[in-house]
Amino acid sequence: DALFTDGTMSELTKNVDLDEINQMLEQSKTHPNVYLTERLQIAKDILEGKNIAQEVFTVEQRGDGVFHARNILKTSSYGTNLLPTGIAALAGEQIKVYVEVEEGKPLPKITFSQQVGHWNNWQRTYNLKQGENVFTVPKIYSETWTHKVIAGGAIYIVNPYTPEQQGKAPRIRIEGGHNYPLFHDGDNVEVFIQELREYQEKLTAEPNKYVDIVELVNDYAIVNSNMTSALLFLNSPESTPQKTLGKFFAYAGISEQGDDIKHKRNGARANLRLMQPWAFAYAAGDHTGFQQGSANTLFGGSIYGWAEAHEIGHHFDIKGGFIGEVTNNMWANYNRMLQNETDRIAD
């Protein structure tokens, strides 16, 4: 590891010579230490011009949004700490994760997911250590599920820490898997549209090699779906869920500003996902699950329908102050008002 400047193994220390690395690689052919050979090969790739450093990303330090939502804001089940990486992987694939964190500070974790998963079976989370971590992507998908999809899904990082807790932000490099279209609010729309077109071509040509996944991310939400939904996004690329979710927070009495932490969103983020059917839509402990039509609505930028707002309302319900299947409908009714629709009860 003295070859590299940090745990991401993306930059070499000074005075590393290609001829010397080649000699050591030749010698390593008779050496049982595969660990050493892999590092020498990485060093050779860098010396021969491969820009591994561009694969490194800095991990967000948003703090523990789940704890804040459920213990400070007192919502029933709102919030996720998942951080999208834009990398997906198939079940059985080997993934290497290189991590650099300040010495003695808490480490992030990694989550492997199943795209269009089951409400209580769609993710696996593992610890990370400094330097290299090797994983075989777990198979979560079941052939008994209603919607038949490829076994695999997005890779997420979980890092529920602030700079005060963790110091310098962790840096991570993931080797393996494949990139999927991921749009962060504020990204270049034209670049994203081109990524969508290219990914659609890959899915069409080799459907068994790529996960059918597209995600939109902003400070309010992760919105997960597939290329079917993304085609609608192409028609209205300026649309994101931010404005609609902001209205929900305002209605709940949760603000973006002010000094009282008990009433501030403080980075709490929703997790809205295309999932296997479990009713038309549902609210689980860490996400809201939708079917294709509802996911299309989210991607198209339209305001939610009754079912979507009803389920999100479950997450917003306040602990100790809600009546199941009743108070969550405040958000559904509020949605009706936003759209100037008539409520059948009012009639």
Predicted stretch roles:
Residues 1, 21, 43, 189-203, ...:
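Generic structural signal of hydrophobic/aromatic residues within well-ordered alpha-helices
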Residues 2-24, 99, 110-118:
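Non-catalytic terminal regions of proteins
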Residues 10, 71-73, 78, 210-211, ...:
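Extracytoplasmic low-complexity repetitive segments enriched in small/polar residues
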Residues 26-184:
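Beta-strand-enriched, solvent-exposed domains that form extended recognition/catalytic surfaces
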Residues 131, 143-146, 188, 198, ...:
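Short, solvent-exposed coil/turn linker segments
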Residues 173-215:
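Low-complexity, Pro/Ser/Thr- and charge-rich linker/hinge segments at domain boundaries
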Residues 199-347:
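Catalytic cores of extracellular degradative/oxidative enzymes
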